[in-house]
């Protein structure tokens, strides 16, 4: 069955199996990539949830702290500053409420959903307590302020507890996602090993098929071709089936038999040609006229050779002139190659300097970010100092006249904390501007690096082209020298041919007597040669 299998059919099945394996490998890789993308997206959402939670609580604390600062400033008679504090507290409260709502909306797991709902309810209580603080501040009611401040503290404690639980839940979910990713990776590795094994098996089967059904018959056919080319037709060609290889052997068998028949006919013609050649020696007298005509043509040929000698000498002179011009072009090409090499070195140095500057700017961006982190810590410390000053002022107010001096000191501390907070915000704005400018400079330096690299690539390509031109001009110069030398040799040969033609003309006159007998024998020989030509024409070269 395999002996009659078509080669194209076998190759079709081989390619089909490889295509199916490749398709299955691609599909499995696509499936793994989609799963990994989903896990990465879920992990990113988990990180965003943690950020929303922390930012919401931070803004809630800052909202309450601004109310406390506003209350102290209002007690001190700074109504305008207290109003700004109240407005900032409302803004921070709204932002934190938005973050909490987004956290609840994106909490999809049941356990996380329950904690998120509880967080939303507790945050509503805290927001209500902070609103009560703002109302007590507007009414200048110290008693009411202390009452709602206690409620806010209790609510904040519950919020901190819920935050810790939510952070733990989110962390566990992240670890679960990583475990699922590890399991997916293990499955992908096992599948890759299986596909590799299938590919190796298919490759071995394909090689066995090709070696047995294609290479071995082709080697055998090559042996037949070598024997036929050397004239050995004694080994018969055997068939190999009905496929393409079998058809090749059938045609080879036909060619062998055809050559045998042709060789037999050529042998018969050769015997007849031998008899005609024996009579040719006695009938050369008729060639005398042809020899006389040959003498005249030799005279014309001698004249033509003389003219050819003059033309060849002119070619030699032109070749020498061209060689000189090519040498000048070669010098110009060498100068251009040196200039391109210098340009390449300068462009490479400029690219390295731009890359070094880009690295320094990247370091500057990192240092600016570190300064921003330090400013965040300073701002947090100033807020805590403000709260401590507020508590100190409250305690001084309770102490009456005995705590007045302490109240003045607490007010000064609060003022310093407030100024520190404002200065920190201004520095953060300046740091943001510096960071934006630095990142723009980094992008510009990267663009310059890319343009410099493009220029370097173009210059390198130009250098390669000039190198090719330089090599081509050198080769042209060498060939021109060869042409000039060959033309000179041809001129000498032409002069020698002229002398030989004169000698041949003399010899042809002496051969006229024997040429007459050659004519009749040539007629018989022409018929035999025509028959042999027809037989040989059966072979296609």
Curated annotation (Swiss-Prot):
Keywords: Cell inner membrane, Cell membrane, Chemotaxis, Membrane, Methylation, Transducer, Transmembrane, Transmembrane helix. It is found in: Cell inner membrane. GO terms for cellular component: plasma membrane. InterPro entries: Chemotax_Me-accpt_rcpt, HAMP_dom, MCPsignal_dom, Tar_rcpt_lig-bd. It is a multi-pass membrane protein. SUPFAM superfamilies: Methyl-accepting chemotaxis protein (MCP) signaling domain. The chain crosses the membrane at residues 11-31, 190-210. GO terms for molecular function: transmembrane signaling receptor activity. Residues 212-264 form the HAMP domain. Residues 35-187 are annotated as: Ligand-binding domain. Disulfide bonds: none annotated. The keyword Transmembrane applies. The keyword Membrane applies. Induction: Expression is induced by beta-ketoadipate, via the transcriptional activator PcaR. One of its GO terms (biological process) is chemotaxis. Its main location: membrane. Residues 269-505 form the Methyl-accepting transducer domain. It comes from the Bacteria. Residues 32-189 are periplasmic. Disruption phenotype: Deletion mutant does not respond to vanillate and shows reduced responses to 4-HBA, benzoate, protocatechuate and vanillin. It could not be ruled out that downstream intermediates are sensed by the chemoreceptor rather than the hydroaromatic compounds themselves. Chemotactic-signal transducers respond to changes in the concentration of attractants and repellents in the environment, transduce a signal from the outside to the inside of the cell, and facilitate sensory adaptation through the variation of the level of methylation. PcaY is responsible for the detection of multiple aromatic and hydroaromatic compounds that are metabolized through the beta-ketoadipate catabolic pathway, including vanillin, vanillate, 4-hydroxybenzoate (4-HBA), benzoate and protocatechuate. It also senses several nonmetabolizable aromatic compounds. Belongs to the methyl-accepting chemotaxis (MCP) protein family. This is Methyl-accepting chemotaxis protein PcaY. The lineage of its organism: Bacteria, Pseudomonadati, Pseudomonadota, Gammaproteobacteria, Pseudomonadales.
